[in-house]
Regions:
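Non-catalytic, mostly N-terminal accessory regions of nucleic-acid modification and defense proteins
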Residues: 1-137, 234-258
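SAM-dependent methyltransferase catalytic region
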Residues: 100-324
């Protein structure tokens, strides 16, 4: 950018914005201050503002209608569409490798498995899981009239379900997307949950924070996609409450990364938690970046997670009866 003073100035401005937003969005803008030496290593594309540049194309292609400027909650799903396009070339490379009998490694799995779910499918799934569960416990609710894809259960379908799921308050609903991608399922679940909280009389300024704290969980093997999911949910919350950032509530989005232990570390873990689990159990997530949400945690780990002191902040809610896998 040495020959483009204006582009250099905008690059410095971009770096400054990254530093500023780190406080509110640490999962999106990592600690990139000068003391970390990170933001100065950020590669700025040449000709940032030139004809045909990435920024210029983005401004021209992303119209106000695409971004949902007239919608109070915006159109955060555009983030997922952009990311799908961003990784499409890499995905094609991996797929071509499959045709040549090449196996996908940990680095190829995220690109190969990214599939953006169409909006109508998202609405159908969420309305007939989260929405139906709420309606079963609150049959007088009129919210279902707003759900275009909701299917009223027949008498046979609803018989006996009242005792299985008895959701008294919105906080009792826990929604987990074990392969959340850029968060399309969770962002629509946010909208539906907001309607539920609103109908129950909660203060509008409190609802976004309550949803992110109590209701929504996501897991993803693609670190970039996980960051985008957290960003999309945060923007959803911010669109509903202008003072949301002051609450300092972060989305419950977990990047699934491999965790492996050596034999001596296994012994230390058993001593620490006063259990006697073998190495295979402790290394359940050694290839988490390959298998992701396909991994079924052994019952011993589930019980340990639910009983450990750390579970007081809500880890154990991932295993209770009101958990909904989408």
């Amino acid at each position: 950018m040495a020959d483009d003073p204006q582009g250099l100035a905008y690059g410095l401005l971009l770096q400054s914005e990254c530093r500023f937003w780190n406080h509110n969005l640490p999962f999106m803008f990592e600690n990139v201050g000068k003391e970390a030496g990170r933001v100065d290593e950020l590669l700025m594309p040449a000709d940032l503002l030139a004809e045909g540049s990435v920024l210029r194309n983005a401004v021209e292609v992303m119209t106000p209608e695409d971004c949902g400027v007239d919608d109070p909650s915006g159109n955060v799903e555009i983030i997922g569409w952009l990311y799908q396009y961003y990784i499409s070339e890499r995905k094609n490379e991996v797929m071509d490798g499959f045709k040549k009998n090449h196996k996908a490694g940990a680095n190829e799995i995220p690109a190969a498995t990214q599939l953006f779910t169409p909006d109508w499918i998202v609405r159908y799934l969420v309305q007939n899981t989260v929405g139906r569960l709420w309606m079963q416990s609150h049959p007088d609710s009129q919210l279902y009239k707003n759900w275009d894809y909701y299917i009223q259960p027949s008498g046979d379908d609803s018989a006996g379900n009242e005792d299985i799921f008895n959701i008294q308050v919105p906080e009792d609903l826990t929604v987990c997307d074990p392969a959340c991608g850029s968060g399309h399922m969770l962002t629509y679940a946010f909208d539906l949950l907001y309607e539920i909280y609103e109908e129950e009389g909660y203060a509008p300024s409190d609802i976004p924070g309550l949803i992110l704290k109590h209701n929504l969980y996501g897991m993803e093997i693609d670190e970039r996609a996980a960051s985008l999911a957290a960003f999309a949910l945060t923007m959803k919350a911010r669109s509903r409450s202008r003072r949301f950032f002051k609450k300092q509530v972060e989305p419950n989005i977990q990047h699934i990364s491999p965790i492996a232990f050596k034999e001596d570390e296994v012994a230390e873990l058993n001593d620490l938690y006063q259990v006697n689990l073998d190495s295979m159990v402790w290394n359940t997530y050694a290839k988490a970046d390959v298998y992701g949400s396909l991994i079924q945690p052994p019952q011993e780990l589930v019980e340990l997670a639910a009983s450990s002191p750390e579970s007081e902040d809500g880890i154990d809610t991932l295993f209770d009866l009101s958990l909904i896998h989408i």
